[in-house]
Amino acid sequence: MGKIKPDEIRSIIKQQIQQYQQEVASVTIGTVFQVGDGIAHIYGLDDVMAGELLEFQDNTIGIALNLETKSVGVVLMGDGTTIQEGSFVRATGKIAQIPVGAAFLGRVVNPLALPIDGKGEIKSDINRIIESPAPGIICRRSIHEPLQTGILAIDSMIPIGRGQRELIIGDRQTGKTAICIDTIINQKGKNIVCVYVAIGQKASSIAQVVNILQERGALEYTIIVAATADSPATLQYLAPYAGATLAEFFMYNGQHTLIIYDDLTKQAQAYREISLLLRRPPGREAYPGDVFYLHSRLLERAAKLNEKLGGGSMTALPVVETQEGDISAYIPTNVISITDGQIFLSADLFNANVRPAINVGVSVSRVGSAAQPKAMKQVAGKLKLELAQFAELEAFSQFASDLDQSTQKQLARGQRLRELLKQVQHSPLNLENQVSAIFAGTHGYLDVISIEHIPIFLVGLWQHLVNHKPKYGEILNSTNTFSEEAQAILIESLKYLTEEFLPPVK
């Protein structure tokens, strides 16, 4: 091996010096001077931005929420038990974002989009910011497509359109989650991606939802975002935004999505906890002043996009829990004013075995009727009015001793219509079955059937139409209208069944 001459060594060193590029990265460092209850106060982070992610020495991530004169208030995404006073904190220069994509379908993730179902890692190269801005006015178009829930009372009287925000409100244990799960099950085969966000719920309750969706074959098109009751308040606060971010990926790719926030009361409570620990001034019911903005910026992300942006949609079903039916409390009134209508569930109706326990008089959809299928509009137009008149008559009849024939007839029909709207959990109805049931009730074909036999009669009617009159279903599915031909087929079937299926009431 030849010796290297000193001149060659010198030229190599010079060459290396010329090629050397010095990379200097400046990192903003702060010091923890107080930590506890999921909150850390940092000194020295002068250039930090609102909402910026911060990294602690133990790799815990936090979000800068309070920017004060001499310190920064940070909410932690972990328990923070290993963070010590005096430890260093690094500003990342990023704001919260999560991976998104089709790989998340059928999975259960936490609000940071990390899998918690034991099925392995989720691989995705696409990231979206958690706090994405809502689509502007020009980006939207009016709601015109129906979103069928499969629940007769909702689809007929409180219809929901794709891109709408419909609040589900009621006391605890009145069937709010059941309506949401039934709606997800009913989207099977309709090319709709569903996102179910569970906020502050028991892990056992979330596991039950996962099992139901799996049994019904609905998990394959559903993403579940879970922030359990033992999760830090920060994750419970972020969970709905993470769910909206996952749904937005599909919406901006021209697909239809349905997102359920179960429930926003617990998110508001988590945000109240964070705000009080950060020493923000409390307002009504000790909530901070920006609790309205907390929900408005979330629910405004639901939209029906115009054709230029692909025509996708995000339909939001936020859930709010009331105390003793008090819808005039702070969070219920806030969310009612943001949404496009509400479905009110009554504890009294639930206890009276009217399930789903929807109070039709108080419930309203401000948009959905524009998106209701024509067939449903044709048969359900007078249903809400008839039920309202029946409720008034029923209250009056409790005080009256003798009622005339027409009043008795109206009461009998009202009782049958109420029975008609009862539905077994996890058994959503398709459009042709809904239309046939409402037509039978409003046109007096159930008047001769005893109330306890109505569910059996309806099942018999639906089976008869499928087995002997398939043309009826074909007309409704192909045209979405209740044509004269379909009406004639249905009347013929109803006449046959009222004579043959059950004996008339004596």
Swiss-Prot record:
Residues where ATP binds: G170, D171, R172, Q173, T174, G175, K176, T177
Keyword Nucleotide-binding: yes
Membrane topology recorded in Swiss-Prot or TrEMBL: Peripheral membrane protein
Entry's localization field: Plastid membrane
Gene Ontology MF, one: ADP binding
Top EC class of this enzyme: translocase
Keywords, in A-Z order: ATP synthesis, ATP-binding, CF(1), Hydrogen ion transport, Ion transport, Membrane, Nucleotide-binding, Plastid, Translocase, Transport
PROSITE patterns membership: ATPASE_ALPHA_BETA (PS00152)
Marked site positions, Required for activity: S363
HAMAP family: ATP_synth_alpha_bact
Subunit structure: F-type ATPases have 2 components, CF(1) - the catalytic core - and CF(0) - the membrane proton channel. CF(1) has five subunits: alpha(3), beta(3), gamma(1), delta(1), epsilon(1). CF(0) has four main subunits: a, b, b' and c.
Family as reported in the entry's similarity comment: Belongs to the ATPase alpha/beta chains family.
Full protein name: ATP synthase subunit alpha, plastid
Natural source organism: Prototheca wickerhamii
Taxonomic lineage from the root: Eukaryota, Viridiplantae, Chlorophyta, core chlorophytes, Trebouxiophyceae
